[in-house]
Amino acid sequence: SSLINKLSMEMKKLKLKPAVLAVDPTSHVTGGAILGDRVRMSESTDTGTYIRSIASRGATGAIAHSVRNSLRILEYAGFNPIIIESVGAGQTEVEISKIADITVVTFNPHTGDSIQTIKAGITEIGDIYLVNKSDLDGATQLFQALRDFIGTGEEEAVILKTSVKKNKGIKELASTLKELMKQKIKDKKSSEKSRVESELEDIILNNVRQEISTMIGKSKSFSSYLKKVQEKKMDPFEAADKLTKNFIK
């Protein structure tokens, strides 16, 4: 969030109108967003950047269902670019890459699983790979590891380093994003079909999930199968298979 704070300020210098959608963890007490991201971006708020915190609410990955609609509203309001900050790793970033035009995958030197994350395939989804907190020990080694794992593809990967503490690399990141935005606008027609397809699929799966959840709540057979599983008379996979067949008759 500190990085996005500085990045949004730099983008304003490039005559852009940034907005930030921060997908925050959900409070187990209130069900709302825990506004840690927004607190850390107070400097951007002071300079007029629109910042909206959205609770993840246990959605697939960490992307709330409202993100897409929020994007539409912000686009109509003339904000560009719209920065989506995720709350986690792995599946979260994959979900974001289906929504966003440009995906920036960020690594920190002191995150113990950074190299494992690189090996795990997260490097397949990014347009830019960023080593943040590059002033810390281990940043150079992490940067080189990224070059080794990512630089073997057909297209040359964009790998950058930033340091919010020393205010280094932020300007280069903002300029790189602006140039990528221009290129993505040219290529948008070819990518639009896959984005719409992904959105439609997500909506259908959400609808099915809600419908099944309602059926489970009303189902008498669910309690019966639950008891069988608890008493070890049936394994959960067999029970789930039978219940699913009942629900989709």
Show the residue positions of the predicted features.
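Electropositive phosphate-/nucleotide-binding environments in soluble metabolic enzymes
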Residues: S1, N5, G61-R68, T140, ...
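Nucleotide-state-sensitive switch-loop elements of NTP-binding domains
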Residues: S2, K6-T92, I99-V105, H110-S114
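Residue-level signature of catalytic and energy-coupling elements of molecular machines
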Residues: D24, E85, I122, N132, ...
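Long, well-ordered amphipathic alpha-helical subdomains in the mid-to-C-terminal portions
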Residues: K161, E172-I248
